From Swiss-Prot:
Belongs to the universal ribosomal protein uL23 family. HAMAP family: Ribosomal_uL23_B. GO terms for biological process: translation. The keyword RNA-binding applies. It is found in: Plastid, Chloroplast. It comes from the Eukaryota. Part of the 50S ribosomal subunit. One of its GO terms (molecular function) is mRNA binding. This is Large ribosomal subunit protein uL23cz/uL23cy. Binds to 23S rRNA.
Length: 93
């Protein structure tokens, strides 16, 4: 199960990078232990703490029909000092 969807780059997440904390959206059904194991295995880092919160989906209207987007979970992963996750490169066009 590939738990991490994508990295999040907001004002708060960029500020947390200075504290060696990385923010990403993950699948809503994944657990903390699964994400921790996956991050440690894939990136070769040591995770010391994980914070998560569930963000609600937003309402979307299309004519008379009211729908909604899916909810998702956001994880803030704190690494041990000396470890870092390499920056994600954006594809240039």
């Amino acid at each position: 199960m590939d738990g991490i969807k994508y990295a999040v780059f907001t004002d708060k997440s960029i500020r947390l990078l200075g504290k060696n904390q990385y923010t990403s959206n993950v699948e809503s059904g994944s657990t903390r232990t699964e994400i921790k194991h996956w991050v440690e295995l894939f990136f070769g880092v040591k995770v010391i703490a994980m914070n998560s919160h569930r963000l609600p989906g937003k309402g979307r209207r299309m004519g008379p029909i009211m729908g909604h987007t899916m909810h998702y979970r956001r994880m803030i992963i704190t690494l041990q000092p000396g470890y870092s996750i390499p920056p994600l490169r954006k594809k240039r066009t």
